[in-house]
Amino acid sequence: MTKEILLIDDDADELEVFTEALRSVDKNIQCSHAKDLNEALDFLNHNSPAYIFIDYNMPTMNGLDCVSEIKKMEKLENTKIILYSNYISEEMSQKAISLGAYKCVKKPSMINVLIKNLKEILNH
């Protein structure tokens, strides 16, 4: 069964690494990309992915704002939203969860750690 995932990140290199890691976890994953909230909302108006991964640090709107906007879409009530960043404070994590995020994760510097984290998230 194909799992559809949306990655929201303005960094093309990060998207490439994340996509490769996801595909190493599960070959049946279909990844779509958006560089900002506007692109994401355009995509989400026509699609309902199983998971949405959002980078916290983006130029026009931070990840918490993205979580808040996406959670307003009723059709995505079962979609799991994961916020990720190089640094996740306890306060940021609590705020994201209160806004409806499924989980907050720190971006690991090593691909094998990223793959391990993704396996845990996707196999829940």
Where are these regions (language model features)?
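Active-site beta3 strand of CheY-like receiver
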Residues: 47-53
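Active-site residues of response regulator receiver
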Residues: 9, 55-56
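Helix N-cap/capping motif at the beta->alpha junctions
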Residues: 33-42, 63
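Two-component/phosphorelay signaling modules centered on CheY-like receiver
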Residues: 12-32, 99
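Short amphipathic alpha-helix used as the core "switch/output" element in two-component signaling
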Residues: 42, 64-77
